[in-house]
């Protein structure tokens, strides 16, 4: 079959989000053809180029979300009126929907229908006129948004929006709705695929929704991170009006995608709960765990005895959400009971905030653990080391996990813990905080403690450091669990089955091929019966009965006219 793979800031770009699993999916399903429709996020991402594409990728079409030239489309009076009506309806839903995730079901359904009608109305207008880039950037759009914010019934945060807030929201909506103006939805584009697979939420689902609306192509939505949750986590400093209105848009778009999709997949139960909260039908939901290549970790997983029994390892991106401060304080408690224990922090900072956090952690480690020397002529050595993968000591991620007997995860916010799965594939016992999908991933093969609790973290680490046999049992069980649930093979097989399920239930009805010739078996044969099943004729109903039973009934008495006085 032919799959339309829809991505935002992802595959096939080298620095794309979720690039790795999309690349593995395309390579693993070589029996299918893929048409990739990619939305880029920046000029630098486009300049970095694409990853090598396999032969089953037939074509790639791209469009930028970070830049859009004015389409120079001048709307006529009737088109301007239609745009104003649709955009006003969209804005009214957002201003009334902000913060109403707990609204009654009937009200929520009504608002969802209003959002869908406005969205598809804008899409149809863009298709007829050639684009809405100029209209969405216009002063009229900002004024329409302002009227919706000031209208009776608008949420408090929307009513408090000021001019800078309105401009920020209008600019975001213009960028988010740019897929409406693309020419991807004709019969030679997404209309020619058998299935659209959106690799994330947000803008990536819009082409899939429009392909379904215009041509009836079924839609599959995959989310390893729910976009609404990401919005809440990444915009804590935004003005309340901006944060509320953008959250309303993300929530409404997600709800419409879940409603129209044939199947919605989540990477873990944590993301699945968010999807249900945003309106996804539980019958449509599937959990497909991310697939990871187990081969690089095979050597470490098959030789756990090579690890240093007195070394703890932390691996990940250095940022405040990882809570390395609590880990360092927990390590101070561990050193009181196990003075020879060492901690290796392996990871690179993420952005300026991560770099500043790394400097803070280095300073805290130097304060908690002054360099210790075994003798007057031996240089001091700090029990905490900060390293990065790619150096001479740790050239590969597997080398980092192989260096220690216990792997620690100290996060306060976590989605799907990739580093935890890598530690499990390496056959290492783990101590983790109870956040995100940690419990779902770890099962009963590791120790789990509350977040922001250095004492509990220290006690769990000490318990494993003191018991080599327990470490070995947990490590072996963790590796077996990871090989069963989190490999590339299971991920590819799961999506292959979902593809077949969707196409069997919702096939695209095409009766002509590309050359205009009839397609064999495009329409199933239909049986024609010579009578109605629901209302059998009397002769059929009494075929085995007496002949007189089929005659018309005879009146007992003839009709007698009423006398003149009775009329």
Where are these regions (language model features)?
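Aromatic "clamp/platform" in nucleotide-sugar-dependent glycosyltransferases that forms part
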Residues: 412
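Nucleotide-activated donor-binding/catalytic signature segment of Leloir-type glycosyltransferases, i.e.
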Residues: 358-392
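Donor nucleotide-sugar binding/catalytic pocket of nucleotide-sugar-dependent glycosyltransferases
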Residues: 146-179, 244-299, 306
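Short acidic/histidine- and often glycine-rich active-site loop of Leloir-type glycosyltransferases
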Residues: 435-448
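Conserved acidic donor-binding segment of nucleotide-sugar-dependent glycosyltransferases
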Residues: 447-454, 463-469
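A short, well-ordered alpha-helix in the C-terminal region of glycosyltransferases
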Residues: 456, 470-485, 491-501, 511-514
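Short hydrophobic beta-strand element within catalytic cores of glycosyltransferases
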Residues: 429-432
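Conserved donor-binding/catalytic core segment of Leloir-type glycosyltransferases
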Residues: 301-335, 342-349
